[in-house]
Amino acid sequence: MGERVGFGSRRSRAVHRLALSPACWGVNEDGGWGHQIDAERVLSEAVAVGEGAITAGPPGFLPDRSDQAKSLLRRQHVQVVAGQVHAILHHHAARGPELAHIDGHAHWLAAIGADTLVLSAIPERSPNAARPGPLSNAEWAHLLHLVGSVEHVCARHRLKLAVQPRFGSTIQGPEEIERLLVGSEAGVCLDIAHLVIAGADPVEVVELAAGRIQHVHLNDVDPDIARRVREGSLDYKEAIARGLYMPIGEGGAKVERVIDALRASAYSNWYTLEQETRLATSDDRPLGRISRSLEYVLPLLS
C-alpha cells in the first residue's frame, strides 16, 4: 500500500475535521448531470474557503493513477479523507466482480491517503438507479455476508468501512438500517439529507447506531421537495435541479440537532459537507452556496 499523504489545513484536521465533497461543485459521474468543474478548480476553491480536506469524488475526478492523484493533491495542499464506492451486494452471482471492484477502489483510496471507504448498496450497476422492491430474506443474507467481506477488504488496506443508508439504494429507511445494524458489525455513514428523504429521523439513527458511525455527510433539504421525492412524484435528479439541497441551516433537516446528538455520542471522525447540485453552465458559481453552509456549520463544530 502507498504511503499516507498528510497535508491540508491544520485547522480542518485539529479542530473540526470538516471536509468538502466535490458534489458541492456539481461533480457527478452521471454523463447527463450538468456542467462539470475540473479537479484543479475544485481543489483550489476548497483551499480558498479554508478547508484543506476533501472526499475523493466519483471515478475520473482525480487521476486513476495514485501517484498522479497524490501529485495533484500535494500541489494544491489538499488531503483526501474518504471516498465512496457503489456496489451490488444482494446478488450472490455478483460477489466476485463486486468484491474485486471494491478492493481496487480501496487500494487506490489508501494509496492517496484516505482513511474511510463509504459504501452504498445499489440495486444495479449505476449510482442513480431507481430502487426496486424490498429485498428477500435470501438477498439480505447475501448483502450482509458481503458487507462482512468488505470489512475484511477495508481492514487489509487499513481503511474504516462506513455503509451509507442512501435514498434509492437497497439500504435507506429505518427498517433496513436496523437490519444492517443487527445483522453486521459494519460502521455507518450518516447522511442527514438521504435519511430525511427516505423518511428516517437522523437523530434516532445517531442514537441507534451511536458507536458505529464512522463518517457523516452534512447537508440540508427543502422539506416539501424531499417529501415529493419520497412519495415518488418527483425524480431525485430533477429534484436537485429544483433546489432539493439548500444551504445548511436554511432547510428542514434540523442539522444542529443532529450535530448535538453526534457530540453527545462522542463522535470524533470526519464530517463532510455533501450538498449535491447540478450546474447548468460554466457561469454557475457554487462557491457562494458552499460558503453559506460553512458559515452555519463551522460554529457548530468548533
Regions found by a protein language model. Name each.
Residues 2-11, 92-189, 197, 268, ...:
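Active-site acidic/histidine proton-transfer and metal-coordination neighborhood
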Residues 9-15, 43-48, 62-82, 100-114, ...:
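Acidic (Asp/Glu)-rich catalytic clusters
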Residues 10-38:
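Boundary/entry segment of secreted carbohydrate-active catalytic domains
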Residues 17-19, 53-55, 77-84, 115-118, ...:
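Structural preference for beta-strand elements that scaffold enzyme active sites
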Residues 20, 46, 54, 73, ...:
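Conserved, mostly hydrophobic/aromatic
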Residues 35, 53-68, 88-99, 167-172, ...:
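Acidic-and-aromatic substrate-binding clefts and catalytic sites of carbohydrate-active enzymes
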Residues 145-249:
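Acidic/histidine-rich catalytic cores of soluble enzymes
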Residues 283-302:
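C-terminal helical cap(s) of enzyme catalytic domains, especially alpha/beta-barrels
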